[in-house]
Design a protein with these regions (language model features):
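Nucleotide/pyrophosphate-binding catalytic subdomain
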Residues: 1-193, 197, 287, 362-364, ...
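Terminal amphipathic helices with adjacent charged low-complexity linkers/tails
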Residues: 1-12, 209-226
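Short glycine/serine/threonine/alanine-rich loop segments
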Residues: 76, 147, 205, 270, ...
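Conserved beta-strand edge residues that scaffold enzyme active sites
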Residues: 83-85, 156-157, 214, 279, ...
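Short hydrophobic alpha-helical runs that function as membrane-insertion/retention elements
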Residues: 149-153, 207-209, 273
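A conserved regulatory-domain signal marking ACT and ACT-like small-molecule sensing domains
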Residues: 218-385
Length: 385
């Protein structure tokens, strides 16, 4: 749909793209023997397409038409997300209104199919969640209806203790806590959108990640208390970070210095990920995609207003070692550092959360794939994972 939007926006012929999209929905309806006249709906929507078609409306139609087919297949009522998932004009989800509308729809129909990924402003215009936002919609629906469990069906059999593309035969995780999953999801374990966890976590609703292609596989269950297990639950990593290394003598005694530094990044709309510190140096780690256009301006502002010297370390990869059972266990950090040392991988950043739920190390991105594979093997050999 994004490709189609681009063609429409710039006046590039788009008939083949739309025919391919529409043909896929028609094929699914026919193969399942559905009575719904999806062709008529697709033709009606096609007539509205043009250069000024709202992008959010267009992009949301993928989920919309999928939900139309699913509701026909299951025999459940179709409820458009635009009618029940409401946003205020500043883009924030209107929890109270959405909860009321969802409950009213459920009370009226009993069984519902609601497309994910989008909702609507008070005036009816479509607003999208971020990419992967169908997970978020499902989570809020479970919350609004006080469900016992939120089953998220995807194309993998739950969560693995490391990326299967980088580690050899990683173990599947049977049970994991909400907090552990948020850490792993944020750091690159993209099975479930990290923003889909909090809505059900607040209510104690369990999440079960299942594989559509292997329905008998129990997958992974996410709960408040996942019980005992190995010290390390899983590892995940992400490339694309940049570190602004800020030097100034006696900065540790300068009240408000760190606040002033963070204010600079806030002014450019950049989220700060981590802040390792020393007596006369701090490192501000951010996503490079957020900072790329502002690097020189940030350096200039910090140096001119704070009297500091700034260097930049690009192409940084962060790897997170996550485990609810790491707290109070000695030797885990030593094992991690030893594994990297034995494999000739230099650690440039070390961060640990106060609750000892994670250990994050920063390395040169060129070693990212090898580092995760080595780390997984080493932790398993040590009996820590």
């Amino acid at each position: 749909m994004y490709t189609l939007d681009g063609h429409l926006r710039y006046g590039v012929p788009d008939d083949k793209i739309w025919d391919s999209i529409a043909g896929r929905y028609t094929e699914i309806a026919k193969s399942l023997g559905l009575s719904i006249d999806i062709d008529a709906e697709l033709r009606a929507f096609a007539k509205t397409l043009g250069k000024n078609t709202d992008q959010s409306l267009l992009v949301s139609r993928g989920e919309y038409f999928c939900a139309r087919l699913m509701s026909a297949y299951l025999g459940f009522a179709f409820v458009d997300a635009a009618d029940v998932i409401r946003f205020s004009f500043d883009g924030r989800l209107d929890l109270e209104t959405s909860a009321r509308l969802v409950r009213e729809a459920f009370d009226s129909h009993g069984s519902l199919v609601v497309p994910g990924f989008y909702g609507a402003y008070p005036n009816g215009d479509i607003h999208l969640f971020s990419r992967g936002g169908s997970d978020i919609t499902g989570s809020y629906l479970a919350r609004f209806l006080n469900a016992e469990i939120y089953e998220n069906w995807t194309d993998v059999s739950g969560i693995y203790s490391a990326d299967p593309r980088l580690a050899k035969n990683p173990k599947p995780i049977e049970r994991i806590t909400y907090e552990e999953l948020r850490e792993l999801s944020y750091m690159g374990a993209n099975v479930l959108h990290e923003d889909s966890i909090l809505p059900v976590q607040d209510c104690g609703i369990a999440i079960n990640i299942r594989n559509t292609n292997e329905p008998d596989n129990d997958g992974t269950v996410i709960t408040r208390d996942a019980g005992e297990g190995t010290p390390v639950t899983g590892i995940a990593g992400k490339k694309g970070f940049i570190s602004f290394v800020i030097h100034k003598k006696h900065m540790s005694g300068e009240i408000g210095f760190l606040r002033k530094v963070l204010t600079v990044f806030e002014g450019y709309g950049i989220n700060v990920e981590h802040i390792p510190t020393g007596m006369d140096v701090i490192s501000v780690i951010v996503l490079e995609e957020q900072a790329a256009r502002h690097v020189h301006a940030i350096i200039s502002e910090i140096e001119s207003t704070l009297g500091a010297q700034v260097t930049v370390d690009r192409n940084l990869s962060l790897i997170a070692i996550v485990g609810r059972n790491m707290a109070g266990r000695y030797g885990i950090s030593a094992s991690v550092f030893g594994i990297f040392g034995q494999n000739g991988i230099n650690i440039k950043v070390i961060v640990q959360s106060p609750d000892e739920l994670n250990i994050i190390v920063g390395i040169d991105a060129e070693h990212h794939e090898r580092a995760i594979g080595c780390l997984y093997d080493g932790l398993c050999t040590a009996g820590l994972l």
